[in-house]
Amino acid sequence: ISLGNDGDFQDKRFVDIINNDLANTIGNLLNRTSSMSRKWFDNKVPNNEKILSENKLENFAKIAVENYIYNFDNYKLDLAANEVLSLAINTNLYLNDNQPWLLIKEKDNLPLVKEIIYNVLESTRIIGLLLLPLLPELSTKINEQLGSIYREEIPWKKQLIWGLLVSNSSLPKPTPIIN
C-alpha cells in the first residue's frame, strides 16, 4: 500500500495484510520464542551470552531499522512496513536455522541456546517498536508480551538500538497479539 502516485489505500486490504502477514509471521514468532524462554529459563528473558563471533540477526536488524527509518521519513510506508515483515521473516529463519529446541537437549549448549533465544526476543522487540508509528496498538501488545514497554521520555529511534531487552526480566503470561 503506497502513498502518493494515486496509491491504493483500502481498509480491507490493509487489514488482510496485517492479519495474514503479521499474525502468521510475528505472532507465531513471538509465541514460539517466548514459550521456549518461559519453559527453559523460568519465565524470563535469558542472558545474552554473546558467544557467537558474529550475530547475523543483529546485523540484519540494524540494516532493517536503517531502511525502515529512511522509507518512513520519505513517506514510503509500504516499503517501511515491508522492512518490518522482512525482519520478522529473517528472525524466523534464524530461529529455524539454529534449532534451539534440539540444542537444548545437550547441557553444554545452554549458553548458545540462551544467546539464540535472546537474539530472537530482541529482534521481536525491535519489530514491535518499528510497528509503533504504523500500528501502535499492535506494537504495544508485542512489547507487553516481552515485558518491555515504549518509553515516551526516550526518543523512539534511540529505543531501536540492539541489546536493550533486559536479561532476566519476567515474561508475562501470553495473550494473542491479533484477534
Cite the ranges covered by each PLM segment:
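Catalytic adenosine-cofactor/nucleotide-binding cores of aminoacyl-tRNA synthetases and other
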Residues: 1-52, 149-171, 176
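Conserved, charged catalytic cores of large soluble enzymes
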Residues: 4-8, 30-68, 88, 92-109
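Basic, alpha-helical terminal appendages of large translation-related enzymes
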Residues: 7, 12, 70, 75-76, ...
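Amphipathic, non-membrane alpha-helical segments in soluble helical-bundle scaffolds
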Residues: 15-30, 47, 51-58, 74-82, ...
